[in-house]
């Protein structure tokens, strides 16, 4: 069985390890854990990982966030991966830092990356893991917040949640969406 694991983020060193690029960080951690290696390919950095008899095509689009769907659609079609075997990992300001939420479908919630994926796939029915980043920013400064780096005191919890998100990817592929949702959606993370 084949899966497409998508980390949403913006390409470029200035965006490395920002809140908005947590999708990239999670996918990078998954690929590193399983001794994969990213290669620059069409529309994305791509790594192939084999684990427990399953193939994971892991991508970090190089298209910028608001065009991520182009890369998702291209790699889904190229690798002939069913929409239910896609997992998109993204940041979410509406969730506190200690939460993650796994869903089989849903709205874009105002997230430009998810909006692009939805438009390119012509569907809202694809699994997504929302990584809570909190909303501790003054009114009108959301862009600065999401494009900003983690605060020092947030880093231990972010590191833990990245490890847990890697486990979510593994569980999604081995146990299925429903069982994994039960575990993830009720959990609160702390260090």
Language model features: what each stretch is:
Residues 1-105, 115-129, 136-141, 148, ...:
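Nucleotide and nucleotide-moiety/phosphate-recognizing core
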Residues 110, 114:
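Short glycine/serine/threonine-rich phosphate/pyrophosphate-binding segments
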């Amino acid at each position: 069985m084949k899966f497409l694991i998508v980390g949403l983020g913006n390409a470029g060193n200035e965006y490395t390890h920002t809140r908005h690029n947590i999708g990239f960080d999670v996918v990078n951690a998954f690929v590193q854990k399983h001794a994969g290696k990213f290669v620059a390919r069409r529309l994305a950095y791509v790594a192939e990982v084999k684990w427990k008899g399953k193939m994971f095509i892991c991508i970090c689009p190089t298209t910028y966030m608001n065009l991520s769907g182009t890369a998702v659609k291209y790699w889904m079609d190229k690798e002939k991966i069913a929409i239910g075997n896609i997992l998109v990992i993204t940041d979410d300001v509406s969730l506190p830092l200690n939460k993650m939420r796994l869903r089989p479908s849903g709205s874009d919630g105002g997230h430009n990356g998810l909006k692009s994926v939805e438009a390119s796939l012509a569907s809202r029915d694809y699994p997504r893991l929302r990584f809570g980043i909190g909303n501790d920013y003054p009114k009108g400064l959301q862009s600065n917040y999401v494009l900003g780096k983690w605060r020092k005191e947030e880093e231990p919890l972010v590191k833990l949640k990245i490890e847990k998100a890697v486990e979510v990817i593994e569980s999604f592929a081995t146990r299925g969406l429903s069982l994994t949702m039960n575990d993830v959606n009720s959990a609160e993370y702390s260090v």
